[in-house]
């Protein structure tokens, strides 16, 4: 690629999926520019690495570009896309550029509706602990390197495989993981769940004949597709007796998990005593997937165990800000999480209750997309009703037009009818901080969830406490 393409421009470079690819390309020696309407930590980091960042979308931004990379969030009427097509500059989907990176290394692609970011991060951490120095591109910021991506010198590249627009079909890894298959982004699949499952089969079949698919058989839909797959398979699970890699003796220890991992493939059966520096049974499953990958690649057991015990976490994946003092006296625990699907919310709430037993759970949630709210309305009502206190902000549209009866007021009404809790509707996200300070009690656990603008709320709430720590420290 490099002998023909030297300058690559990213439209929407501040997005987590875009910024990681851009960073790897910078470190490979490419000239990178990009546009994004807003400055964020990703754009600032890329600028420090040498990227040219524009905070407008304009045709002149791509004047010297040899290729233009876009995500599905970028529409065809974007002035940079129009200019690129007029000048016959290749306009490349983000996943296609990611596929080019996979061609440079042995690719490991992590797919599934939930758990991709954490599992990708765990796999990268295990390989790093084993001295493999992997390249990785992750949807969240891995705290140990404070970045979404890193160019390593080793033979492996670990990436997230995005099913939301079926673009993971561009990828051709040598090893893949499928964590689960759930109803989300269904408009991509014409609201046909069988089509979604078949697309996952097609993705797995992109593996070479010597490749390996690591599949979670606790998920019924993943189990259903195994008979359709012709590539080698390793299975993992907690609840499935036939899983080749499984966990028993699972114990919660506040924000850590302890379990025995039983490995029944690649050599004589053996058991690892694992401490996972993450909370929740869903993260035990993510860890089992990472163990399966490490086992397949011949990573020593000691490196696997150490990587899981010392895992530094990912931004906005059960990110803890500690105890935040209340104005008068007392404090509340503050947790921030990117989860925005009912299954993710349920798993994160369960993890919070096990990590902080007996404490009141206050959930502040911002629904993401009107279409998702409509398609999963009853599931949202059921799951959100499980909080002790619910703060519900208006839907983050993510470019969508409003849909009748798929807004947060409608959700609040439906939850109220259940009679379990009285949701507090917050029309403007800017009002969330004041509302939390109004209702918070000593000992509360405040869990902030959502994939939209609510992501700024936890740092804002924690800022006074962080400043106080700096002053007194």
Swiss-Prot record:
InterPro entries, alphabetized: Mur-like_cat_sf, Mur_ligase_C, Mur_ligase_C_dom_sf, Mur_ligase_cen, Mur_ligase_N, MurCDEF_pg_biosynth, UDP-N-AcMur_Ala_ligase_MurC
Name of the top EC class for this enzyme: ligase
EC number(s) reported in the record: 6.3.2.8
GO cellular component, one term: cytoplasm
Catalytic activity field: UDP-N-acetyl-alpha-D-muramate + L-alanine + ATP = UDP-N-acetyl-alpha-D-muramoyl-L-alanine + ADP + phosphate + H(+)
Localization: Cytoplasm
Gene Ontology molecular function terms on file: ATP binding; UDP-N-acetylmuramate-L-alanine ligase activity
Binding residues for ATP: 112-118
Keywords: ATP-binding, Cell cycle, Cell division, Cell shape, Cell wall biogenesis/degradation, Cytoplasm, Ligase, Nucleotide-binding, Peptidoglycan synthesis
Protein's pathway: Cell wall biogenesis; peptidoglycan biosynthesis
Pfam families: Mur_ligase (PF01225), Mur_ligase_C (PF02875), Mur_ligase_M (PF08245)
Span of the signal peptide: none
Primary subcellular site in the record, as a coarse category: cytoplasm
UniProt GO BP: cell division; cell wall organization; peptidoglycan biosynthetic process; regulation of cell shape
UniProt function note: Cell wall formation.
Entry's family note: Belongs to the MurCDEF family.
Protein's name according to its UniProt entry: UDP-N-acetylmuramate--L-alanine ligase
Organism this protein belongs to: Nitrosomonas europaea (strain ATCC 19718 / CIP 103999 / KCTC 2705 / NBRC 14298)
